[in-house]
């Protein structure tokens, strides 16, 4: 199970939104390239990058910053926000992005997601961003008429890298993840699930580690890293030791 630090880009700055609200922006670093280097130096094995301008407008406003981040670090990047065409997906793969995250088009253009997953197996993730169980699109500004569970079920036919499940009500709040919603998604999905939203403490990470064998393979952490609630290096070590202990205990069961 990976702990994946997040960088959200808005006007070229590293920010966090509260529950996806573009009117509640906290700027954490005016140099997102430097921030990416910091996360790699603290042991991150993957970076979660979101183009908030792209998610809202569909325009690649932050491409220069994205390219600079890619050049500055060696770990793989998964990128989402405003990717709504095959041409845009190919542009991002061409500059070295490891995975792209599709959200809005999974609802509006499902055939495009299907085509991309065939052309780029295990390199497409789908973001299921839900509010009260229903999927939101267009940078969380529009509510769809499909439930998160129904969408996860529809995606079972595709060879995805992961489903990134975000509970909008908890995102940016530090109040803990919606564990029940995550377990329901993981139970219904054949694809691996990455948890996102609400992580506020190492205790929250530990609570999700219990479900590593149920299909939750990663946890995205944002605000808690920036405000010091979680130290990335400590969190990675804690989770690693916990999972090793669980594996050791499981092995002991077979030896008894």
From Swiss-Prot:
GO MF term set: 1-(5-phosphoribosyl)-5-[(5-phosphoribosylamino)methylideneamino]imidazole-4-carboxamide isomerase activity
Localisation per UniProt entry: Cytoplasm
GO cellular component: cytoplasm
GO annotation, biological process: L-histidine biosynthetic process; L-tryptophan biosynthetic process
Pathway the protein acts in: Amino-acid biosynthesis; L-histidine biosynthesis; L-histidine from 5-phospho-alpha-D-ribose 1-diphosphate: step 4/9
InterPro entries: Aldolase_TIM (IPR013785), His_biosynth (IPR006062), HisA_bact_arch (IPR006063), Isoase_HisA-like (IPR044524), Isoase_HisA-like_bact (IPR023016), RibuloseP-bd_barrel (IPR011060)
Active site per UniProt: 8, 129
Primary enzyme class: isomerase
Keywords annotated in UniProt: Amino-acid biosynthesis, Cytoplasm, Histidine biosynthesis, Isomerase
Catalytic activity: 1-(5-phospho-beta-D-ribosyl)-5-[(5-phospho-beta-D-ribosylamino)methylideneamino]imidazole-4-carboxamide = 5-[(5-phospho-1-deoxy-D-ribulos-1-ylimino)methylamino]-1-(5-phospho-beta-D-ribosyl)imidazole-4-carboxamide
Main location: cytoplasm
Enzyme Commission number(s) of this protein: 5.3.1.16
CDD domains attached to this UniProt entry: HisA (cd04732)
Family: Belongs to the HisA/HisF family.
NCBIfam families named in the record: 1-(5-phosphoribosyl)-5-[(5-phosphoribosylamino)methylideneamino]imidazole-4-carboxamide isomerase (TIGR00007)
Name of the protein in its database record: 1-(5-phosphoribosyl)-5-[(5-phosphoribosylamino)methylideneamino] imidazole-4-carboxamide isomerase
């Amino acid at each position: 199970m990976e702990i994946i630090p997040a960088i959200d880009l808005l006007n070229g700055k590293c920010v966090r939104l509260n529950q996806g609200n573009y009117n509640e922006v906290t700027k954490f670093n005016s140099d997102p390239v430097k921030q990416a280097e910091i996360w790699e130096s603290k042991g991150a094995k993957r970076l979660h990058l979101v183009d908030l301008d792209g998610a809202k407008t569909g325009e690649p406003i932050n491409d220069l910053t994205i390219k600079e981040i890619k050049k500055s670090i060696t770990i793989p990047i998964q990128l989402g926000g405003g990717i709504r065409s095959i041409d845009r997906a190919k542009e991002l793969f061409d500059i070295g992005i490891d995975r792209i995250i599709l959200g809005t088009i999974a609802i509006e253009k499902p055939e495009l997601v299907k085509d991309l997953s065939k052309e780029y197996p295990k390199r497409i993730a789908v973001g299921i961003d839900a509010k009260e169980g229903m999927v939101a699109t267009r940078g969380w500004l529009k509510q769809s008429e499909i439930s998160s569970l129904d969408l996860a079920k529809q995606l079972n036919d595709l060879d995805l890298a992961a489903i990134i499940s975000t509970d909008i009500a908890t995102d940016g709040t530090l109040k803990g993840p919606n564990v029940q919603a995550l377990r329901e998604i993981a139970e219904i999905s054949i694809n691996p699930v990455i948890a996102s939203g609400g992580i506020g403490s190492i205790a929250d990470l530990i609570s999700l580690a219990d479900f590593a064998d149920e299909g939750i393979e990663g946890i995205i952490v944002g605000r808690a890293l920036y405000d010091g609630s979680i130290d990335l290096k400590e969190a990675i070590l804690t989770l690693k030791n916990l999972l090793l202990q669980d594996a050791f205990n499981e092995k002991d069961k077979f030896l008894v």
